[in-house]
Amino acid sequence: MTDFSLYLVTDPVLGGGPEKVAGIVDSAISGGVSVVQLRDKNSGVEDVRAAAKELKELCDARGVALVVNDYLDIAVELGLHLHIGQGDTPYTQARELLPAHLELGLSIENLDQLHAVIAQCAETGVALPDVIGIGPVASTATKPDAAPALGVEGIAEIAAVAQDHGIASVAIGGVGLRNAAELAATPIDGLCVVSEIMTAANPAAAATRLRTAFQPTFSPETQTELSQTELQGAFVNSPSAPRVLSIAGTDPTGGAGIQADLKSIAAGGGYGMCVVTSLVAQNTHGVNTIHTPPLTFLEEQLEAVFSDVTVDAIKLGMLGSADTVDLVASWLGSHEHGPVVLDPVMIATSGDRLLDASAEESLRRLAVHVDVVTPNIPELAVLCDSAPAITMDEAIAQAQGFARTHDTIVIVKGGHLTGALADNAVVRPDGSVFQVENLRVNTTNSHGTGCSLSASLATKIAAGESVEKALEWSTRWLNEALRHADHLAVGTGNGPVDHGHLARRMTHAAETTPWAHLRAPRLDGATAASFTTPSTVKSPAPRIEPAGPFTRALWEASGDIIAGINSSDFITMLGDGTLRRPEFDFYIDQDAQYLAQYSRALARLSSIAPDSHAQIEWAQSAAECLVVEAELHRSYMAGKEVSAPSHITMAYTDFLIARTYTEDYVCGVAAVLPCYWLYAEIGLMLAEQNHDEHPYKDWLNTYSGEEFIAGTRAAIARLEKALENAGAEQRVDAARAFLSASVHEREFFDQATRHGWTMVGSS
């Protein structure tokens, strides 16, 4: 019986060309692929036939089933299994024409299609499909015209029906490490993947990770029946973090070399290991001396690691000499390991060459045997024996030539170029280019950026990401590390980047200690001076004045929250125009989600307001929210998919609905006011940085405009009046609601810079 646990569908385009497919398949089979389907939508029939013959020879030798997609005549001619889609040869006709000993698979997009083929087979007496490909699980770039996504629950429902009829099933479309374990708890028999393996730098490693993640026996029911020892044994080959080895020199001050590599590996979610090639006496001012231990000691270090630990990826840094390069190359060629990323350390910051001609030539030879090379602009020029590029296009052209002649992926890094952008790019051997936008950070503290990017890249590739996705993540992470480098205060020269800033920021954001104003003792609320406590951080002078003593007291109580908002990365980058567009788009999407619920809260206030004037104003505000929401969708989100509210957005809107529907009027007004007041204050502050070329000019104009400012003043006045008329207990509750809403406001702004960091290799 065929093992469908890991079913690979080939794609010559994703694989870098038809000539690369067989090599990818061979590697993937070594990693655990159990079924291979030849799918090629772009080549002519003769090319497909030739590819089928090549893969048949390979798969027969490896004992793996080969399936051909769509081509019934080729399947019959070569004795291959066949897979057809809903728009191909009708199933019953294909089953009758295909020899009985060959398996026939069918794409199923919904339950009706499965019921239909079961009924057709019963009516005609034709055998049921041997296997069905159910999907898509999620939207996928490899089949943009696919049916609507089913989700894991939809897959499970269809697979259960198939199982009842003795039909095997695999999940396809948007399948990867991120959902493999979840799919393993459904009745499906396997995972069907395309890009997860076809674009992987190491197909074998990618396949192994998928096989490890997909444990069909570990359903929620059976897990409870297994002992803890059995569970530990079952997952012994599923490490919690990719194991990444750095082979490089040292930096005692920690900014470069193995010290930077280990920080970068940890930042990327990996477990870092290191083998030292050279001991370097350097600091932020430069290199003083270099001591290279005997090669026998280097070999002993390598033996110590490889004899004991599985190495999921390797980052190569400073190798120093031709002998060292040759030894490392020999070692890598004779030992099992994951993808190799080579950072060709050849040029010092001063411009001096660090390697002699023989060592440079050895590095060029080594490049043929690694998966990714990450030279800076001067190093790329040396590798190509050319003058340094002065534009990104020139650098990409050099990289295309080197990638083609050395059959490796080259990362072009724009840091040494000039201009506002310091983009990075993936250049594949087939000449294809994937460019990652990256705004330049103006700092002299950039020591070790090359080491850091390469180590991060290796970690993300080891975690199962494509090189393109790995570069996107690493570029974004390193940009943040550069933006906060000046605050590290390490050394008096060109200091290091802040490798740990993202981790510290995320740790702080995850803190669950109740907010300070909720832990503080309740005040008596008798006066404006006794219903809340001033913040330990002085509040800035308000641009929109409080309407009286109560709202002034609330403003003075918010100093720490306001400071947190104003100094956040989101607000800082929004103001200077360096905010990444994906982060702004996410923010706008969540703002639209928020306004739909905020409108409900304002409408509720209209229904319980104590006077007709307030009722009318709240009702008008509620209507304006819906207008603004619609305008956000029209202006900023046209053509973009609208997502669901994040947990941060829901926490805020649920809080507002709860305060306005279950608490007194004054408490509800206090809860909704920070959205007005803080937004307007921030809008006026950011307006000072606005200009005609600002990428977010229109948004900044919206929240600093006179109409919004006037609405804010009116809302402040309504709260002041409500607090004047409220009882002491109501005032204290209202103050807490105002401060809680202000914290929610801070979290709402900050969430965009927390979005999109988790990748398939993260837990």
Swiss-Prot record:
The keyword Kinase applies. This is Thiamine biosynthesis multifunctional protein ThiED. It catalyses: 2-[(2R,5Z)-2-carboxy-4-methylthiazol-5(2H)-ylidene]ethyl phosphate + 4-amino-2-methyl-5-(diphosphooxymethyl)pyrimidine + 2 H(+) = thiamine phosphate + CO2 + diphosphate; 2-(2-carboxy-4-methylthiazol-5-yl)ethyl phosphate + 4-amino-2-methyl-5-(diphosphooxymethyl)pyrimidine + 2 H(+) = thiamine phosphate + CO2 + diphosphate; 4-methyl-5-(2-phosphooxyethyl)-thiazole + 4-amino-2-methyl-5-(diphosphooxymethyl)pyrimidine + H(+) = thiamine phosphate + diphosphate; 4-amino-5-hydroxymethyl-2-methylpyrimidine + ATP = 4-amino-2-methyl-5-(phosphooxymethyl)pyrimidine + ADP + H(+). Residues 1-210 are annotated as: Thiamine-phosphate synthase. Its cofactor is Mg(2+). 4-amino-5-hydroxymethyl-2-methylpyrimidine binds at residue 282. One of its GO terms (biological process) is thiamine diphosphate biosynthetic process. Residues 550-763 are annotated as: Thiaminase-2. It comes from Corynebacterium glutamicum (strain ATCC 13032 / DSM 20300 / JCM 1318 / BCRC 11384 / CCUG 27702 / LMG 3730 / NBRC 12168 / NCIMB 10025 / NRRL B-2784 / 534). GO terms for cellular component: cytosol. 2-[(2R,5Z)-2-carboxy-4-methylthiazol-5(2H)-ylidene]ethyl phosphate binds at residues 140-142, 174, 194-195. NCBIfam families: HMP-P_kinase, PRK09517.1, PRK14713.1, thiE. Its EC number is 2.5.1.3, 2.7.1.49, 2.7.4.7. Condenses 4-methyl-5-(beta-hydroxyethyl)thiazole monophosphate (THZ-P) and 2-methyl-4-amino-5-hydroxymethyl pyrimidine pyrophosphate (HMP-PP) to form thiamine monophosphate (TMP). Catalyzes the phosphorylation of hydroxymethylpyrimidine phosphate (HMP-P) to HMP-PP, and of HMP to HMP-P. Mg(2+) binds at residues 70, 88. 4-amino-2-methyl-5-(diphosphooxymethyl)pyrimidine binds at residues 37-41, 69, 107, 143. InterPro entries: Aldolase_TIM, Haem_Oase-like_multi-hlx, HMP/HMP-P_kinase_dom, PM/HMP-P_kinase-1, Ribokinase-like, Thiaminase-2/PQQC, ThiamineP_synth_sf, ThiamineP_synth_TenI.
